[in-house]
UniProtKB/Swiss-Prot annotation:
<dbReference type="Pfam" id="PF15299">
    <property type="entry name" value="ALS2CR8"/>
</dbReference>
<feature type="compositionally biased region" description="Low complexity">
    <location>
        <begin position="577"/>
        <end position="592"/>
    </location>
</feature>
<keyword id="KW-0238">DNA-binding</keyword>
<dbReference type="GO" id="GO:0003677">
    <property type="term" value="F:DNA binding"/>
</dbReference>
<feature type="region of interest" description="Disordered">
    <location>
        <begin position="572"/>
        <end position="592"/>
    </location>
</feature>
<keyword id="KW-0010">Activator</keyword>
<dbReference type="InterPro" id="IPR029309">
    <property type="entry name" value="CaRF"/>
</dbReference>
<keyword id="KW-0539">Nucleus</keyword>
<dbReference type="GO" id="GO:0000978">
    <property type="term" value="F:RNA polymerase II cis-regulatory region sequence-specific DNA binding"/>
</dbReference>
<dbReference type="GO" id="GO:0001652">
    <property type="term" value="C:granular component"/>
</dbReference>
<comment type="function">
    <text>Acts as a transcriptional activator that mediates the calcium- and neuron-selective induction of BDNF exon III transcription. Binds to the consensus calcium-response element CaRE1 5'-CTATTTCGAG-3' sequence.</text>
</comment>
<dbReference type="GO" id="GO:0001228">
    <property type="term" value="F:DNA-binding transcription activator activity, RNA polymerase II-specific"/>
</dbReference>
<dbReference type="GO" id="GO:0005634">
    <property type="term" value="C:nucleus"/>
</dbReference>
<dbReference type="GO" id="GO:0000981">
    <property type="term" value="F:DNA-binding transcription factor activity, RNA polymerase II-specific"/>
</dbReference>
<protein>
    <recommendedName>
        <fullName>Calcium-responsive transcription factor</fullName>
    </recommendedName>
</protein>
<dbReference type="GO" id="GO:0071277">
    <property type="term" value="P:cellular response to calcium ion"/>
</dbReference>
<keyword id="KW-0804">Transcription</keyword>
Length: 725
């Protein structure tokens, strides 16, 4: 008998008085609510299953056919048929000289007919087991017992009185109501339901003890119906996993909750409404989990921050326990084939009925528990159990082995996260997004919009796709450590076309990098760098942004990114002033032309362009507005490169400069990508061509109010102050 579709129908008819005494007989009929005859007043075909006689004789009845009031009956009669209309055979035997009777019910199975013997503890109680295993207790009007025998594996339903003048009743499964002249107290006990999804053969023993158990990531979730059962499962889980737990959060003794819900973060949807019993869930953390931020730990944290100690990753394993009160009698169908509009209407109807009768609704208590496996523990070693309860308590299935192999291949970090989620964290950190809540926001968008379809998004409590703040902190730390060690190689394909940094409020933050190169002691030494940031109105193209964002993590990697761009110790001019830019292998060109163009570009805060095989023309415009445009126009398109593979570029410190403080210059790479270089000190530059075909830039004084050097002024510069390097 399906619990959601079948119902019990009780017909109450006033029988004629017999010669011995006036008796009332009733018919208890089990019918399928989907039957066309359901709800009609005509008498269906029934089978009497219990009869109490005045004498102690053995009675065996199997009476098909309708019962009428003309039949002479000396006792109450209850009739039961299954959903197919088939009669159920039974035998009722008396025990000794008392009125106590024993019910024997036959139910067919695959292996034949099975007899169930149910001895009642008190007289006047008849117990019937219907074939589907539902236990129905009906009390006699003369003796109302407070306790009843029941099978712990079967649900129990009692019948209570509704009204004396009622003739027909509909009893839904797990619903209690009274019959005339029947005084009953109702109690509902839940059956041990099967798992929502099939569990593998290697499911831990402690997980099999949970009702409606299902696997979520590296945890198992189910529920218990009593505190004793809950404590038993928790104790068995601790013994099996050899783990120690501490309570991080416990529910407060707040006023009873009245908000009706269908599902929550801890309770899956099963078509049964519920209210929370307690304000918060119980959260238990592993002993190697995050440390509490108490008063005594403030000094320790300050010392650690001052000494710049490494971040210590903590175990993310947690146990969640949520106590709720369920109302199974207001269940709605969960069949996915049913129209969603009908289900919503049923939900609204159930909510409205519950709001009116919430105080007297009763319900059952459930403790929903989510227990992690051994794979959920990280950053520490688990103790080996002293006494193994089974040869292989936690065998690893082929599916889990495959998942572990994929995880090890795609992500070098030991993680319970899904490999694509862990890779997304690595990608975000490599792009400069390191704030925990910013990363979590991006991860949620990634999972809900890219990984899954809208109807297939996993629940938020699945930590494989929705990691906790502690998980995100651990991953960010691991990625940063890999970047510092140079273990992580950037993939330019994952960098978006337009990369934008945003502040906490969502505003776009545009910055440029100020790079200062220091001089080495010898020509063979590498040059160290110092990086500063300044806001600007410009934006960077993807490749320079990618390059500069990685510069703060590991500075030596910038040289491998530039490939053909090699940095050498800076050259100096004869008056020992440092040169700004030196380019080798330049073809000979007119000194005045180079002087005019480059001098104008430097002083007008525009891009500095050097061609590999083409020089700048003499007729370059020297105005501030179009100097860069004229320079770009005079260079052929294939040769608009600053530095080629065989060229050497050297950038040195600038000292004692003039009016160029705060100006930004760009060096164009091979694909016309720019690196902004900001000149902090004030100076101006002039250029000459030496016999070795090397262009050097040295310092000269500039008048503060002179916007640019004219063509004639640059030609008349005293070249005696400059010499070849």
């Amino acid at each position: 008998m399906e619990q959601s579709n079948d119902s019990l129908r009780v017909n109450h008819n006033d029988g004629e008085e017999s010669k011995t005494s006036a008796q009332v007989f009733e018919h208890l009929i089990c019918m399928d609510s989907r039957d066309s005859s359901f709800g009609q007043n005509d008498s269906p075909t029934v089978l009497p299953i219990t009869t109490r006689e005045a004498n102690n004789s053995l009675i065996s009845q199997n009476i098909p056919g309708p019962l009428t009031q003309t039949q002479t009956l000396s006792a109450e009669q209850f009739h039961l048929v299954d959903q197919n209309g088939q009669a159920i055979q039974y035998e009722l035997q008396s025990l000794g000289e008392s009125n106590a009777q024993m019910m024997i019910v036959a139910s067919p199975t695959e292996n034949g007919q099975v007899l169930r013997v149910i001895p009642p503890t008190q007289t006047g109680m008849a117990q019937v087991i219907i074939p589907q295993g539902q236990l129905v207790d009906v009390n006699s009007p003369r003796d109302v017992p407070e306790e009843k025998p029941s099978n712990r594996n079967l649900p129990t339903v009692r019948v209570d009185t509704l009204a004396d003048n009622t003739s027909n009743y509909i009893l839904h499964p797990q619903t209690s109501f009274p019959l005339p002249k029947k005084s009953v107290t109702g109690m509902l006990e839940e059956p041990l339901l099967g798992p929502l999804q099939p569990l593998s053969s290697n499911t831990p023993i402690w997980a099999c003890r949970l009702r409606s158990c299902e696997k979520i990531g590296d945890s198992y979730r189910g529920y218990c119906v009593s505190e004793t059962e809950l404590e038993s499962v928790l104790t068995f889980h601790k013994q099996q996993t050899q783990s120690v737990w501490g309570t991080r959060q416990s529910p407060s003794p707040a006023k009873p909750a009245t908000r009706l819900m269908w599902k929550s973060q801890y309770v899956p949807y099963d078509g049964i409404p519920f209210v929370n019993a307690g304000s918060r869930a119980v959260v238990m953390e592993c002993q190697y989990g995050p440390r509490r931020k108490g008063f005594q730990l403030k000094k320790v944290s300050e010392q650690e921050s001052r000494s710049c100690q490494l971040y210590k990753a903590t175990c993310p394993a947690r146990i969640y326990i949520k106590k709720v009160q369920k109302f199974p009698e207001y269940r709605v169908p969960t069949d996915p084939k049913i129209d969603k509009k009908i289900i919503r209407m049923e939900q609204e109807k159930a909510f409205n009925m519950l709001k009116k009768n919430l105080v007297d609704a009763g319900g059952v208590l459930r403790w929903y528990v989510q227990l992690p496996t051994q794979q959920a523990h990280q950053y520490h070693e688990l103790e080996t159990p002293c006494l193994t309860l089974s040869p292989s308590p936690f065998p690893v299935s082929s599916l889990e082995e495959e998942e572990t192999a994929v995880r090890d291949e795609n992500c070098a970090l030991p993680s319970r996260l899904h490999p694509q989620v862990a890779h997304k964290i690595q990608e975000l950190v490599s792009q400069g997004i390191e704030q925990v809540y910013a990363v979590r926001k991006q991860l949620r968008k990634f999972v809900e919009r890219e990984l899954f379809k809208p109807d297939e998004v996993p629940e938020r409590h699945n930590l494989s796709f929705f990691p906790t703040v502690n998980d995100i902190k651990n991953h960010i730390h691991e990625v940063q450590k890999s970047l510092r060690n140079g273990d992580t190689v950037y993939n330019s394909e994952i960098i978006p076309a337009t990369l934008q940094w945003t502040t906490d409020s969502g505003n776009i933050l545009k910055e440029t990098m100020t790079v200062t190169f220091a001089e080495g002691n010898s020509p063979g030494e590498s040059i160290t760098t110092k990086v500063e940031t300044n806001q600007t109105r410009g934006s960077l193209s993807p490749e320079p942004t990618h390059l500069l964002s990685s510069l703060s993590s590991f500075q030596p990697k910038i040289f491998t990114q530039l490939q053909g761009l090699q940095l050498q110790p800076r050259y100096t001019s004869p008056d020992e002033s440092p040169a700004v830019v030196s380019v080798n292998n330049q073809p000979s060109s007119s000194p005045s032309g180079l002087l005019d163009t480059i001098g104008s570009a430097v002083m007008n805060n525009n891009s500095l362009l050097l061609g590999q095989s083409h020089s700048l023309q003499r007729d370059t415009c020297l105005t501030q507005n179009n100097s860069t445009a004229s320079t770009m126009g005079n260079l052929p398109e294939p040769d608009q490169n600053l530095v080629a593979m065989d060229e050497l570029v050297e950038v040195g410190d600038v000292e004692d400069t003039g009016n160029l403080e705060g100006t930004v210059h760009r060096i164009l790479l091979g694909d016309v990508q720019t690196i902004p270089i900001q000149i902090i000190d004030n100076h101006s530059a002039l250029i000459e061509e030496n016999p070795e075909s090397t262009i050097s830039v040295s310092q000269v004084k500039q008048e503060p109010k002179e916007p640019a050097l004219s063509m004639e002024a640059k030609k008349t510069v005293d070249y005696k102050k400059l010499s070849a390097t």
